[in-house]
Amino acid sequence: MALKPIIVIPARIGSTRLPQKALAEIAGKPMIVHVAEQAKKAAFGRTIVATDHHDIAKAVIAYGHECIMTSSHHESGSDRIYEALNHIDPERCYNTILNVQGDLPTITPHEIISALRPLKNSLTDIATLGAKIVEKDEKTDPNVVKIIGTPLSQNRLRALYFTRATAPYGDGPLYHHIGIYAYRREALEKFVALKPSTLEQREKLEQLRALEHNMRIDVEIIDTIPLGVDTQYDLERVRKILA
């Protein structure tokens, strides 16, 4: 079946480490607008921001992007995009949903497109991205999520686990997980119907819910790592990059 993708960018106002980060100014524009612009350049067709706050919606619409209001009570970004999808596509025109996190202002269209590649395998439920870790301090940084996976090819892993710890042990590369997901629509529906899992709650990583329920996640390995904004330090780094 041909993939018919839509990009949905979840953006909530609440953030414990960096309050209201979606609206943080970077090179004259809110961070969420930078992400929406890059997603639109991927040229899949429709790109929409799903948010829980009118200030974010106003900012997104002011720059000419589509936005939809969603509940403020969602447990995860995937739950938010599922609500948005049901509102905007009740006819089920889209069978593939790309969840591009709203705190990746340096993401490129190429990286977004790369997230679709693992779905060429019909056995894959969810696709995502990773990159080899080259900075020593990132190997022990709990904010850098690592992928434990079995190689399928030179640029592809089947994910077995995701962790904030330094893993796997021993010689060999470590891989940094990049927060973009491409879901088959049926996989997203299954995922959001599941209760948060034990390891998901322990690691605070929603993708573990899928693995704990035997869903298959394949990872496309790319050469670059878009900078995620979780802290004020990250924000200042991004401001210098995009200045």
Curated annotation (Swiss-Prot):
One of its GO terms (biological process) is CMP-keto-3-deoxy-D-manno-octulosonic acid biosynthetic process. Keywords: Cytoplasm, Lipopolysaccharide biosynthesis, Nucleotidyltransferase, Transferase. Pathway: Nucleotide-sugar biosynthesis; CMP-3-deoxy-D-manno-octulosonate biosynthesis; CMP-3-deoxy-D-manno-octulosonate from 3-deoxy-D-manno-octulosonate and CTP: step 1/1; Bacterial outer membrane biogenesis; lipopolysaccharide biosynthesis. One of its GO terms (cellular component) is cytosol. Pfam families: CTP_transf_3. Disulfide bonds: none annotated. NCBIfam families: kdsB, PRK05450.1-1, PRK05450.1-5. Belongs to the KdsB family. Activates KDO (a required 8-carbon sugar) for incorporation into bacterial lipopolysaccharide in Gram-negative bacteria. This is 3-deoxy-manno-octulosonate cytidylyltransferase. It comes from Bartonella quintana (strain Toulouse). The lineage of its organism: Bacteria, Pseudomonadati, Pseudomonadota, Alphaproteobacteria, Hyphomicrobiales.
